[in-house]
Amino acid sequence: MAQIPPSLQDLVNRFNQAQAQLQNVLLRKQQYEAELKEVEKAISEIERLPQDAKIFKNVGNFLVPQSRDVALQELRDRKELLELHVKTLTRQESMLREQLDKLREEINKELAKLKGGATEAAKGGG
C-alpha cells in the first residue's frame, strides 16, 4: 500500500476537524431551538392569563412570585437572545458546509492525481 502524501493527509485532517466543528454547531443549534420553542410556548401561555394572575419563577430550589409583565419581558428578552444564537449558528453551519465542500473537492483532486500517477507508474513499469 502506498503511503498517503502529507498534503493529502493534511486535507483529510482539516476535513475531519471541520466535520467535528459542524457536528458541534448542529448540536448547539438544536439545543437553542428546543429552548426557543419552550420560551415561545411559555410566552403564549402567559399572554392568555389575566393581568392580575399569580405567576411564579423557578429560582434554584424556590418559586418566587413575579408579575405577569415582568415575566413576559424576561421571556421576550430570552427569546430575542436565543433567536440571535440560532441565527449565528446557522451562519456558522453554512460556512462550515461550504468549507467541507471545498475540502472534499481538494481531497478528490489529490486522490485523482494519486490514482493517475499510480496508473502511469504501472504502465511504465510493465
Curated annotation (Swiss-Prot):
Keyword Chaperone tagged: yes
Compartments, record wording: Cytoplasm
Record keywords: Chaperone, Cytoplasm
GO biological process, one term: protein folding
GO terms of molecular function: protein-folding chaperone binding; unfolded protein binding
One cellular component term from this protein's GO annotations in UniProt: cytoplasm
Database matches in Pfam families: Prefoldin_2
Coiled-coil ranges per UniProt: none
Assembly and binders: Heterohexamer of two alpha and four beta subunits.
Entry's family note: Belongs to the prefoldin subunit beta family.
Function of the protein: Molecular chaperone capable of stabilizing a range of proteins. Seems to fulfill an ATP-independent, HSP70-like function in archaeal de novo protein folding.
Protein name in UniProt: Prefoldin subunit beta
Annotated organism of origin: Pyrobaculum aerophilum (strain ATCC 51768 / DSM 7523 / JCM 9630 / CIP 104966 / NBRC 100827 / IM2)
